[in-house]
Curated annotation (Swiss-Prot):
Name the UniProt record assigns to this protein: Calcium-dependent protein kinase 13
Reaction it catalyzes: L-seryl-[protein] + ATP = O-phospho-L-seryl-[protein] + ADP + H(+); L-threonyl-[protein] + ATP = O-phospho-L-threonyl-[protein] + ADP + H(+)
Gene3D superfamilies (UniProt xref): EF-hand (1.10.238.10), Phosphorylase Kinase, domain 1 (3.30.200.20), Transferase(Phosphotransferase) domain 1 (1.10.510.10)
Organism expressing this protein natively: Arabidopsis thaliana (Mouse-ear cress)
GO cellular component: cytosol; plasma membrane
Entry domain remark: There are 3 contiguous domains conserved in the CDPK subfamily: a kinase domain, an autoinhibitory (junction) domain and a calmodulin-like domain. The autoinhibitory domain (318-348) inactivates kinase activity under calcium-free conditions.
EC category name: transferase
Superkingdom of origin: Eukaryota
Location within or outside the cell: Cell membrane
Gene name as annotated: CPK13
SMART domains for the chain: EFh, S_TKc
Length: 528
């Protein structure tokens, strides 16, 4: 009968065992090939089988080192969360120290309604397990995506909670170092649910005046001094300022299609307050954003000063009018999509059946008022207005620029369908297979750099080699020099935009990025 009769909990438990046991974890000594004893990470906790006291059920989330499961305490039947960190993935002394420090910091910080509570840490031969309170309301990140952005009043409330977490950490000698929307969960699904910080995996203890040089964090939320390898607790306020900017407008203040481009934007420090919806946002909110994103950490606000700022103090009086809609958020998402995905969407558009494309075609024909086969900015603005989608001129211009690969200032039918496909997310596996075959010219089951370059050349531009290399850096996740169908489908389904990119973390990659920035002159270390 196979697996059909087993409970999800049984499957989950077996998955945990398969993840952490077996020959992959076994270590052999140099002499006789005998297995060495499993590594010990936490010296102050008893070694025990977690399943003696807890039932591990369905998977809730997955990170670079750990898998988080729904966890049921056998004695009380309480629902909890368990983050299981595989020892097999702790390959270096630095990795082991990170886990030790994460546990130490969660035990060190006082109990707070804004920080997830660690019930206990335990360890067996295969993993370190952190048993924590369960937060069922989902990520702050996901609520931003679902809404596009918050009202000012809601943004002020969320920002207050985030900065209170920062203040608590700094008061107790901890720098978080990885503040981002994904690391905050709502306790429940209610609108007024408490918000809790959950992940302290990159956090570190500090003493007043102490400086750090290791580049860690998530690209879009990094302070400039992190890139310059000379930073202190002020970086958490910068990251909170980036989150505030996103809460108010739906995109980060510094973004580009490559990590190097993002880093250079951060170092330039130019903040856009002109694009919608910023003209409708209060000056006090903008003032706070500016002071939190102050490039000089010595002049940047402290957590205490942020909480004393008039916009936070008067949060209940802040405007409660929605600042935009989900369509705007999706348009922005499309605007940072790489050229590979844009091309693939156009290929898919050509394969759509008459039924699938009929509604899109009707909309295009209605917008193309002069019947010349293209939609101008004015026609697009008028059409979106007719379809009850209120977009400012800057938003429409951004949409045109995102898909208008030839720089005509207009959209032809194929480009228009590509936009609609992305917004409606109608591409299925059959469409993706056809699009993949278009790029896989030799039919060997992989897209090679030259094949991608040749496809990009069809849309013009002589920089296809550099663009193809950048795309491979992002999409070729197993780094075998080719793009498989699975990697292609993952890119198409999740998007190669800032939301996906913000989840990536790699010490090696950021160290390499820092070297690049020094070589091209972006970093001016002499000013520190």
């Amino acid at each position: 009968m196979g697996n059909c009769c087993r409970s999800p909990a049984a499957v989950a438990r077996e998955d945990v065992k398969s993840n952490y046991s077996g020959h992959d974890h076994a270590r052999k000594d140099a002499a006789g090939g005998k297995k060495s004893a499993p590594i010990r990470v936490l010296s102050d906790v008893p070694k025990e089988n977690i399943e003696d006291r807890y039932l591990l059920d369905r998977e809730l989330g997955r990170g670079e080192f750990g898998v988080t499961y729904l966890c049921i305490e056998r004695s009380s039947r309480d629902l909890l969360a368990c983050k299981s960190i595989s020892k097999r993935k702790l390959r270096t002394a630095v990795d082991i120290e990170d886990v030790k420090r994460e546990v130490a910091i969660m035990k060190h910080l006082p109990k707070s309604s804004s920080i997830v509570t660690l019930k206990e840490a335990c360890e067996d031969d295969n993993a370190v397990h952190l048993v924590m309170e369960l937060c069922e309301g989902g990520e702050l990140f996901d609520r931003i995506v679902a809404r596009g952005h918050y009202t000012e009043r809601a943004a002020a409330g969320v920002t207050k909670t985030i900065v209170e977490v920062v203040q608590l950490c700094h008061k107790h000698g901890v720098i978080h170092r990885d503040l981002k929307p994904e690391n905050f969960l709502f306790a429940n699904k209610k609108e007024n649910s408490p918000l809790k910080a959950i992940d302290f995996g990159l956090s570190i203890f500090f003493k007043p005046g102490e400086k750090f040089s290791e580049i860690v964090g998530s690209p879009y939320y990094m302070a400039p001094e992190v890139l310059k390898r000379n930073y202190g607790p002020e970086i958490d306020i910068w990251s909170a300022g980036v989150i505030l900017y996103i809460l108010l407008c739906g995109v980060p203040p510094f973004w580009a299609e490559s990590e190097q481009g993002v880093a250079q934007a951060i170092l330039r420090g130019v903040i856009d307050f002109k694009r919608e919806p910023w003209p409708n946002i209060s000056e006090t909110a903008k003032n706070l954003v500016r002071q939190m994103l102050e490039p000089d950490p010595k002049r940047r606000l402290t957590a205490k000063q942020v909480l004393e700022h008039p916009w936070i103090q008067n949060a209940k009086k802040a405007p409660n009018v929605p600042l935009g809609d989900v369509v705007k958020s999706r348009l922005k998402q499309f605007s940072v999509m790489n050229r590979f995905k844009r091309k693939a969407l156009r290929v898919i558009a050509e394969f759509l059946s008459t039924e699938e494309v009929e509604d899109i075609k009707v909309m295009f024909n209605k917008m193309d008022t002069d019947n010349d086969g293209i939609v101008s900015i004015e026609e697009l603005k008028a059409g979106l207005r007719d379809f009850s989608t209120q977009l400012a001129e800057s938003e429409v211009q951004m949409l045109i620029e995102a898909v208008d690969t030839k720089g005509k200032g207009t959209l032809d039918y194929g480009e228009f369908v590509a936009v609609s496909l992305h917004l409606q997310k109608v591409a299925n596996d059959e469409h993706l297979r056809k699009a993949f075959s278009y790029f896989d010219k030799d039919g060997n089951g992989y897209i090679l750099p030259q094949e991608l370059c040749d496809a990009l050349k069809e849309d013009g531009g002589d920089d296809c080699v550099d663009v193809a290399n950048d795309i491979f850096q992002e999409v070729d996740t197993d780094k075998d020099g080719r793009i498989s169908y699975e990697e292609f489908a993952a890119m198409m389904k999740t998007g190669t935009d800032w939301r996906k990119a913000s989840r990536h973390y790699s010490r090696g990659r950021f160290n390499s990025l820092s070297i690049k920035l020094m070589k091209d002159g972006s970093l001016n270390l002499g000013n520190e």
